[in-house]
């Protein structure tokens, strides 16, 4: 069938990922209805894959010979696409797809063999990055815009309500801490050495261990 979301607003906001594949530098750029892998030297298309989606926001991540991305609005899907293709790889290089728990806004987080994500509606998910098999899914709040980050064996989440949740980076769900900043936040954590920088609506917090 003909693919495409039918979106009339052909824009996206995803920051491209720049990766090395077999000695060449590829720019992975998701957009409305299609992701392109471009040659950094001349901008030529190395490969492309189509999907239904527009206004793509999450930044793609790279590992295990695949790029992982979310397709944006309307119904987001997380796609794992092998990087060794040429031309249109839509029907040949898609290794797995996940719809339940896929984010519209927060970017994905790859830690070793696991891919972590949190949906805009507050569902956190951990999957096997190689196969897409779900290790766990758990509600961790109501709404999210900020992307998860990893530090010191932990995954850090921050909801729009300003509630920070700390999870173990594990194939088993383990909530280690919950901290309510009592102020709205849409920004992802910043990391500076062993410290976290947190932006809320009215404050900038610097958090470090005593």
Question: Model features per residue range: what roles?
Answer:
Residues 1-24, 30, 48-63, 70-76, ...:
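Extracytoplasmic beta-rich repeat domains
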Residues 30-32, 72-74, 83, 120, ...:
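Short loop/turn segments immediately following the C-termini of beta-strands
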Residues 80-89, 129-130, 166-172, 208-210:
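Short loop/turn segments immediately following beta-strands, especially the blade-tip
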Residues 76, 162-163, 169, 183-210:
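Blade-level signature of beta-propeller repeat domains, shared across WD40, Kelch, NHL, RCC1
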Residues 76-78, 98-169:
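Loop/turn-rich, solvent-exposed surfaces of beta-rich toroidal or solenoidal domains
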Residues 34-40:
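Membrane-embedded hairpin module used as a gating/binding unit in multi-pass transport
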């Amino acid at each position: 069938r003909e693919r495409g979301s039918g979106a009339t607003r052909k824009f996206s906001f995803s920051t491209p990922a720049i990766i090395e594949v077999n000695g060449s530098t590829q720019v992975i750029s998701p957009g409305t209805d299609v992701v392109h892998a471009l040659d950094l030297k001349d901008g030529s298309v190395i490969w492309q894959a189509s999907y239904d989606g527009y206004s793509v926001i999450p930044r793609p991540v790279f590992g295990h010979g695949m790029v992982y991305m979310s397709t944006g609005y309307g119904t987001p899907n997380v796609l794992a696409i092998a990087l060794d293709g040429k031309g249109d790889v839509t029907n040949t290089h898609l290794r797995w797809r996940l719809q339940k728990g896929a984010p519209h806004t927060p970017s994905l987080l790859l830690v070793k063999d696991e891919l972590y994500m949190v949906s805009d509606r507050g569902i956190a998910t951990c999957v096997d990055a190689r196969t897409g098999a779900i290790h766990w899914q758990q509600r961790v709040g109501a709404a999210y815009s900020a992307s998860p980050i990893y530090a010191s064996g932990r995954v850090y989440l921050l909801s729009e309500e300003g509630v920070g949740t700390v999870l173990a980076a594990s194939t088993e769900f383990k909530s280690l801490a919950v901290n309510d900043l009592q102020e709205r936040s849409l920004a992802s954590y910043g990391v500076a050495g062993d410290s976290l920088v947190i932006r809320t609506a009215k404050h900038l917090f610097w958090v470090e261990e005593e």
